[in-house]
Amino acid sequence: MSDNNQCVIVGIAGASASGKSLIASTIYNELRAKVGDHQIGVITEDCYYNDQSHLSMEERVKTNYDHPSALDHDLLCEHLEKLVRGEAVEVPEYSYTEHTRTSNTTTMTPKKVIILEGILLLTDPRLRDLMHATVFMDTPLDICLLRRVKRDVEERGRTMESVLKQYQQTVRPMFMQFIEPSKQYADIIVPRGGKNRIAIDVLKAHIAKLLKA
């Protein structure tokens, strides 16, 4: 864990569609009143997928997005270190339909609390070292698959066939190889998804304690 007490960084990992975004947004909304609207922020690991603008669409589609090599953790670590030092950063914007970054970025200023959420956060020791608390969403894979199909078809313009094919070829195998083993690095393991009220309250209390340290 980082020794810096001016910025509390919380990492929320787990399978795709396990409830990471839901629990992150819930904690964000419920803590804003206590720490201030401008003192808490959420960073999604997906924003740090590699820039693939130099590749054709055919090549982009073939990328294994569930492997650590698909993500620019170097840039994510650099941004977190800058935020801890009190510097603003430009968070990339990623397009799920174009399978690459857009030309847009979002400015993030230093915060008292930064919530990270992403499937592979706990696989990288550099990221783990920057986090003050780590969470793993331990949601059954069959439930994750149902949620993923619904989300990707309705929100990301994909076909059910392509979602199921990707799940069989990369999502599940990479979960077993990388994501599931990273659960050992979690301080808190959350069953039953992002609506687990007890887990949310425990995590909020822990963040409040870290802020007072």
UniProtKB/Swiss-Prot annotation:
Organism listed in the record: Vibrio parahaemolyticus serotype O3:K6 (strain RIMD 2210633)
Reactions the enzyme catalyzes: uridine + ATP = UMP + ADP + H(+); cytidine + ATP = CMP + ADP + H(+)
Annotated ATP binding sites: 14-21
E.C. number(s) listed in UniProt: 2.7.1.48
Signal peptide: none
Pathway(s) of this molecule: Pyrimidine metabolism; CTP biosynthesis via salvage pathway; CTP from cytidine: step 1/3; Pyrimidine metabolism; UMP biosynthesis via salvage pathway; UMP from uridine: step 1/1
Pfam families per UniProt: PRK (PF00485)
Coiled-coil annotated spans: none
Top-level enzyme category: transferase
Molecular function GO terms recorded: ATP binding; cytidine kinase activity; uridine kinase activity
HAMAP family the record matches: Uridine_kinase
The name this protein goes by in its record: Uridine kinase
Superkingdom classification of source: Bacteria
